[in-house]
Amino acid sequence: MKDFLPAFWAVIPAAGIGARMAADRPKQYLQLGGLTILEHSLLCFLDHPRLKGLVISLAVDDPYWAALPCAKDARIQRVDGGSERSGSVLNALLHLHAQGASDNDWVLVHDAARPNLARSDLDNLLGELADDPVGGLLAVPARDTLKRADSSGRVLETVDRSLIWQAFTPQMFRLGALHRALADSLVSNVSITDEASAIEWAGQSPRLVEGRSDNIKVTRPEDLEWLRQRRTEFGR
């Protein structure tokens, strides 16, 4: 890892509702240790000295953001989100271009509901990818036995996990390359699940940088309960 870490922009797509949480508000606005999940997800970036600025993509009718203290942070700029993650990220990238950001600038895209990113993981990602020609993402090697199933839920085979990784965020790519990949994939009606898949579709191979397994995304109620319990155990 390089001793000198590159400057970067952060993009947080936060226009989703998180239906699987079955909560009274979008999951990023649920409480975790006195702050919302979203605030925790932002903090690791806002505390970093190499941050150039942060763009958050929000639902047009979002009623929660303005009440958060961080909404007044001058380093954070708000844009309207899209109907899908890729559209929300693309809107943020277009905003960065309009603000004069360079195609060669690094952009880190992070899930709004991934509140446990460690500073050490962020620094490691920045250092490992500083000179990478493509970029990459935090990820964790698969640990459990993996099964491939048919449409009825019956096991077809056990998958070799030795080369299987779970994709996490942040995902770090050059602004211009990511902008082109997302825009082209949308025009071609390609299903894009994360930024790395857009770069893959464009013919590039992102690098996997191993991170901590506790950098989880809150998707179901038990995920939030696990994080709350963990914070209690460690006194945070």
Swiss-Prot record:
Protein's pathway: Isoprenoid biosynthesis; isopentenyl diphosphate biosynthesis via DXP pathway; isopentenyl diphosphate from 1-deoxy-D-xylulose 5-phosphate: step 2/6
Claim: S-adenosyl-L-methionine is one of the keywords in the record: no
SUPFAM superfamilies from the UniProt entry: Nucleotide-diphospho-sugar transferases
Annotated Gene3D superfamilies: Spore Coat Polysaccharide Biosynthesis Protein SpsA, Chain A
Function according to Swiss-Prot or TrEMBL: Catalyzes the formation of 4-diphosphocytidyl-2-C-methyl-D-erythritol from CTP and 2-C-methyl-D-erythritol 4-phosphate (MEP).
Entry similarity comment: Belongs to the IspD/TarI cytidylyltransferase family. IspD subfamily.
UniProt-recorded name of the protein: 2-C-methyl-D-erythritol 4-phosphate cytidylyltransferase
Gene name of the record: ispD
